[in-house]
Design a protein with these regions (language model features):
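Structural signature of tandem-repeat unit edges
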Residues: 1-2, 11-25, 35-48, 57-74, ...
Length: 184
């Protein structure tokens, strides 16, 4: 069973939701804008979670699925190699742990308080829209092992002033730095 794309999108008054054990997949933007939802438990049956699930949802997340790990407001895949969603919208700086190899699609989308970010050498790919609309992001240190930067990866990072693309990068997606107005 699937919770479809945008299934509960902008259900501003939704206060509680129990995901049944029959659900195996949760679609893109399923809980966008569910501002009143206090907590959410991902059941053990869930094996697939799409990108950008939690935009404008700041409740408590508990993950019972063996396929995912929730640690300090960060949702990882089961081996913590991919960041699926970063839910700490109030943090101003973040150092991605050195066991992460991939930043998922829209994982940090609109983390508007994030000002500085360190991406360690373990990271080799940055997903589509991974840091899109992180308007306060000014400082970015990128891994020397990154090979791909996805479409719209840094789109709308309007405070980003400088950025060094390492020689290891072989692919930069469409609109990767679109609307980065402060970029020199």
């Amino acid at each position: 069973t699937l919770i479809g794309e945008g299934a509960f999108m902008n259900c501003y008054s939704l206060k509680s939701l129990i995901i049944p054990d029959s659900v195996t997949s949760i679609g893109d933007r399923a809980f966008w804008g569910c501002r009143s939802l206090k907590s959410l438990i991902i059941p053990a049956s869930v094996v697939n979670i799409k990108a950008d699930l939690f935009y404008e949802w700041y409740g408590e997340l508990e993950c019972l699925s063996p396929y995912f790990i929730c640690d300090n407001k960060v949702l990882f895949d089961k081996d913590k190699s991919t960041i699926i969603a970063f839910k700490d919208k109030d943090t101003t700086s973040y150092v991605i742990p050195d066991y992460v190899t991939s930043i998922g699609d829209r994982a940090f989308h609109e983390c508007s308080s994030l000002k500085s970010l360190v991406i360690p050498d373990s990271v080799i790919s940055i997903g589509n829209g991974a840091f899109s609309v992180c308007r306060s992001l000014k400082s970015l240190v990128l891994s020397n092992r990154v090979t791909s930067i996805g479409d719209s990866a840094f789109e709308g990072c309007s405070s980003l002033k400088s950025f060094v693309i390492p020689d290891s990068v072989t692919s930069i997606g469409d609109d990767a730095f679109w609307s980065c107005r402060s970029l020199n």
